[in-house]
Amino acid sequence: MRITLFSVLVTAFCLSITAPVALSAPPDANPFFAPYGTPFETPPFQRIGPEHYMPAFQKAMEEQKNEVRAITMVRSVPTFENTIVALDRSGRLLQRVSGVFGILRGAITTDQLDSIAVIFTPLLTAHRNDIALNEQLFQRIKAVYDKRATLSLTPEQSMLLDNTYKDFVRGGANLSPADKQRLRVINDELSMLSLKFNQNLLKETNSYRLVVEKKEDLDGLPPDAIDAGAEAARNAKLDGKWVFTLQKPSWIPFLQYAKNRGLRETLYRAYCNRGDNNNAFDNKQISARIAALRVARANLLGYPTHAAYVLEENMAKTPAAVYEFLNRLWEPALQVAQKERDAMQAMINTEAKPFPLASWDWWYYAEKVKKAEYDLDEDALRPYFKMENVRQGAFDVASQLYGLQFLERKDIPTYAGDVQVFEVKGRDGAHIGILYTDYYLRGGKRPGAWMGELRSFGRIGDSVVTPVVYNVGNFSGPAAGKPALLSLDEVETLFHEFGHALSGLLSQRSYDNLGLPRDGIELPSQIMENWALHPDVLRSYARHYATGEPIPDALIQKIVRSGKFNQGFITVEYLAASLLDLDWHTLADTTLRATNAFEQTTFNRIRLMPEIVSRYRSPYFAHIFSGGYSAGY
């Protein structure tokens, strides 16, 4: 997943709890208000404290307001330079502060940062509304846009002008004063609901733990998974027990290997019921209200549905085109998944006490079928996927494809001890940018994996601003005297997010508002992910962590042969989530739906197998209800 600087401005404030927070610091002591004085002007994380954000955000918003006011006060005729470019270059301090705040809120949050997020969610929304609905500013933009045919603009300039004009029109600039006020109210409520949705989801995810007291209940689990459970128990002051959580490196191995079917069910139900427990953190009403407000906003802006509004600017263009594409994939995927289910059921039927396959059995029996059909035990592959070797493999692919060099820089500050920083150079040795890698689980880090930008490439006159990007993951770190050893899925995730990082590092544009369509940003990551398990690439980086021996060709062939194994399941769970997303966002009225009944209607319509749960259910579908992927997952 890619997080841009723009989306940081929109969503960095979405998770929160109340706690005391230092509101201010002496202006001359605020690191945001002066050059950092670090290599490549990277953030001096060790000098930035919670007390610096409030005054920095306040000053940054005021600074951008003044920049916008200056544009509207220009007495000369609106031009591309004095209006469009000036607006594009406004808000640099806000980008600077938001970039740092965003990476910390995602990767290593604290109660103080959460409190700042609570305060600034409505303030930032109001600030964005003030710019988007500024009548004087829009009239200047429109004046330039209306004479675009006479301006002899470059392709980049034309795209910036088009994007700027469309953003304002789509943001409500043409609405009446009364409708603009209604739009403000909708945007304000949506921002707070998104905040609450994410808050609830994190609470549900991070507070749950399955405590195992008997060692026999761990039968089947690999030693590394047992050790990780014991360490989690010690951290929870439950020595002598084992703790498993809803973090992916914990629950996935448990479902893959634990023989105890009852505990598999308990853990998987907890995962699938996040936000759906009728408690203080329930997200059902929130998701329904978000969907209804999006319909209201779309209607206000002249669109029949939220999906029509979103997709107009994406490559897909229309909801009908997306439905056609997804439905074309659905039936073949469902047929493959049914065959996979039948193979697992056949295996269960040979056991002493057979039973119907359930969703919490899928990972366990898929692993057994893979072992039987391909003689491949995924856990036995981990010793060949030491994190540092996998990352170097990704670097080497980028070196061969694009001539890049990656040099670790220990002189650049980080925000946590296990974060590493690399300077990226071109074939000629010229500086291209900076990459932070932050791969391991830690308290305060949100689930998942993502790429983001602290600074994007830009040109100001003859000066070039080089990018600073980061990759964040949630892999299990070094433990029990062993380095971090990745699963196949984590290997592909590392390559995937690195593809996003390469996009951020290598994209060159003269203006900020020239990003890719939302449904186009996944292409670089998919290209890079494709190389992760290529035989030639595997031979280059997959080496046993203890002996240094390269992965045997026999194992590579097993990986290749099993490459399409379980793809029916994977495709069905993804497509089910995509279709659920589209069903929510093709609603044409503001009636509040009963969330569980609504999604069940979707799953019944597409005939989703009961043995497979959608990749995301509505109460924890953060991509669409608090992220930037609504009508686009």
Give each language-model segment a name.
Residues 304, 499-511:
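Catalytic Zn2+-binding segment of zinc metalloproteases
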Residues 7-18:
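Bacterial N-terminal signal peptides
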Residues 489-504, 525:
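Active-site recognition of the HExxH zinc-binding catalytic motif
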Residues 476-495:
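Short pre-active-site segment immediately N-terminal to the catalytic Zn-binding motif
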Residues 10, 25-222, 632:
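N-terminal helix-rich structural modules
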Residues 37-52, 101-120, 143-185, 245-285, ...:
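Short His/Asp/Glu-rich catalytic/ion-coordination signatures at enzyme active sites or charged loops
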Residues 160, 184, 189-192, 199, ...:
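Active-site-proximal, well-structured secondary-structure segments within enzyme catalytic domains
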Residues 491, 495, 568-586, 609, ...:
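C-terminal substrate/ligand-recognition segments
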